[in-house]
Amino acid sequence: RVELEKVLHRYQSNPSDSLKYKAARFLIENMPSYTYYKGKLLEQYLTFFTLLQEARSKKVYPQAMIDSIRRMYGPFSLDSLQYCKDVVTVDSAYLCNNIDWAFKVWQEQPWGKNVSFADFCEYILPYRIGDETLSYWREDIYRKYNPLLDSLRASTVLDIEDPLVAARCLCDSLRKRSRFFTTTVPQGLPHVGPEIAQSVSGSCRELSDYVVYVCRALGIPCAIDFMPLHGGGNDGHQWVSFTDKYGTLYFQEYPDKIKEVRKDKMCGASKIKVYRNTFSLNRIMQAEMQRLDTAVVPFFRDPHIVDVTADYAKTYKKKLEIPASMLYSGKPRSRIAYLCGSSRMDWEPVAWAEFDGEHLAFSDVQIEPVMRIATYERGRLRYWTDPFEMTVSGEFHVFTPSDSVQDVTLFAKYPLWQDEKYQKRMIGGVFEGSNDPDFRQKEVLFLIEKQPERLRTMAYSRSLTPCRYVRYIGPEKGHCNVAEIEFYEAGGLLPLSGR
């Protein structure tokens, strides 16, 4: 407390630092729920990220690295680490350094004039992203990356006063860096922190953290937006969001380009809810939930989040009312109901609403994913409906358990978006025919000009000339990713077979 009071006194005593005083208050008022961990075991496990790119060159897979680290240092456990609270450990020197550097970049960069003080406090000023171990990071990152924006600041063509233009210029440079993306990372680790993040290795969390550290160190406002669960998957996903000087929302899934949200397929991606991480505590949400129940699921316990689902969904229900006929009978012990998404063999709360056992409505929910209603009682979920989905037409489809057996045909057992990179690689591929095994004389039978469809694509030969040999040549960097090829006679129902 004494250290934090030093910060307030320093800026309060000088009238020219009135904004810095307000910024200091913003950080301190929202600091109580921030914690972090320290310890040798954490440092040992974080070497995983710094060694990823080296391991790739040696063809060592991430899971093998995790297994090796576990054998060497033992299983990872937060209980073995030192638990620290920001309000106890953050000293005046650290906080003042962070505030002074944040103000420096906000005031010196030309696009800073289009960043409000409120946005500055939320999206540039914070000294941390999540629960990473604290360190001084702003000056080092500023000196390393600020030269990347020299050409932008000198430009007479680009709108150097637009934060999005600065973000695009910077991220176009960051995209050129060597990186290693993998969803296979040690489980249970806190955020890796600014130094490890610059190894540009890990999952979407680590790569998003990297972009945020660099952008904020250079005075570019940004946030981490996330879906707690994919609508058609078992995991969540996160990315970095930006706004231009007019307030239009953009996003980047590093190392992709920055794209406008409303014009991208992100809006159509299957999901239930999207939230934005904020440094400030959502006191309105916290007060409303605590009014209804003192026991809240961990995800909503200290909500440093705001709901931005409406910004990321084209088809969503402003108010999703759950019919009383779908609810199980009984009396809930909690007045909070949670909308849950499927996560492997369990259900994970992603939204909440007031519940009296009969009336229930959730706000801003993207339809189509499978969901279920639950309350949080005695430390576990108590379910109030069978799993259900809402169709585009607004009808509920309930999956009621049955003892009967039903045969089904599965056309996919893996997220379909993973197929796209292979389908796109075939564009430009060509089928050729010849009567010469060396194809010294050949004829184009079919050129792939658009992305093939899933499962099966019908292709009709351009030539009616009989040929004995057929080959497929993939485009440059296409890798010839073809699973199966079958040939049919005109009007034939059975595939031809070679000799």
Describe each model-derived feature in a short phrase:
Residues 156-173, 184-194, 200-294:
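Hydrophobic/aromatic-rich core segments of domains that either
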Residues 290-317:
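Beta-strand-rich domain onsets/edges
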Residues 307-310, 319-333, 417-421:
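Structural motif
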Residues 357-380, 464-466:
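Short Pro-Gly-centered beta-turn/loop motif in secreted/extracellular proteins
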Residues 403-444, 450-499:
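Aromatic, loop-rich ligand-recognition surfaces of beta-strand-rich domains
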